Amino acid sequence: MTNELENYRIKRIEALQPKQETKNELTPAQRQTAIAELKKPNLLQRTSQLLQQCGIVGESTNSLIAYLVYCTRKQNIPLHIMFLGASGSGKTYLQERISELIPEEDKIEITQITENALYYFKQEELKHKLILIEDLDGALAVFYPLRELQTKRRISKTVTLKDSKGNLKTITLTVEGPVSVSGCTTKEKIYEDNANRCILLYTDQTRDQDKRINEYQTRLSAGEVNREREQQYRELFKNIQRVLRPIAIINPYAKYIVLPEQVFKPRRTMTLLLGFIEAITFYHQYQREVKKDNAGQLYIETSIEDIEAAFTLLKDVLFSKSDELTKATREFLESLKQLSKQTGSDTFNAKMIREQLRMNPGNMKRYLSELARYGYIKATGNRYRKGSYEYSIVKMDEYEALKSQIEQHLQSILAGIRELVKSGSVVQ
């Protein structure tokens, strides 16, 4: 029965295929406007400002990182991204807003996908596409082929079919990448294997961000937001995407870039960092001289400014990659430190924490347990007496020290590269 089902699915595959997206051809004026935008000075700063004009509230760093990552779908080795945060923190909203800037023909949006679905796309249907997954829980069944598509940039599946004479034969279904994958989840630990292949972005869950969003919502309801102008900016971004062309990138400074020793899993983190530097170079392609190597291949070169921009944008990503705590637990610990400073008390109990931080008791218990297990807090009291535990922070400045070390390391790399260029050891 399985063979018959596979046979039926193969026969019906063409009929079930969605209609192919027609590529929008730009008018000469649209192309000229898009290229002119890419040639303007301070491109990243200007892009960040324009993103805020598209209805994206706050999240300036996260939105710029995500946009640059989405650009890499056109390259041979794209980057991938994962949005993390508590339920209702705006993960899916941010992904949707950024993906609206990508042409429809270049993206595939998925809410839920079945186990073998990826194998039944046409061979090049996913090539250089952006795959958007609303919630990673909905793609749990395809995690293995999805990881293979991310890493090896192609997947294949061999199935058994019957020919017209009833004889069994095998065929291999092959789907080619590369693809750029973007997804959202609240479960950082569960999807750790997938997270290792992605740049991790944690949504802004501060009260200031809540105020910014509420203010935008009230302005929207009052008719004070120019929706037509927002759409015009979105169309401009889509046209910018259409004029970006694949091109080889060479980073002459790559061998001088060394990750901080504090970073966990340095091999994949280094790949992500170098890839993001190339993403910035790729986005600046209309401002770079196109060169030709000995084999006749065209390429552009990474500048020191690209590396500096990547270090600045990915600073928090590198902090999280160097922290053994999850982002949620880290934020809880930093809130405890702030609470200790405000109250002037070195110790606090569960009731005080819950009342002051206004948080769910279950989450609080989990965070306290994790912090105690890793040695960040010390608990004293009677385990048989409810509410008797008193907690104290072991070291108040450990995170600031970690961030300072990483910051100094990145600055020393930039200073070293500039010195090499100045001395003529590296040709700029």
Roles of regions detected by a PLM:
Residues 29-34, 46-53, 80-82, 128-133, ...:
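Short hinge/gating elements
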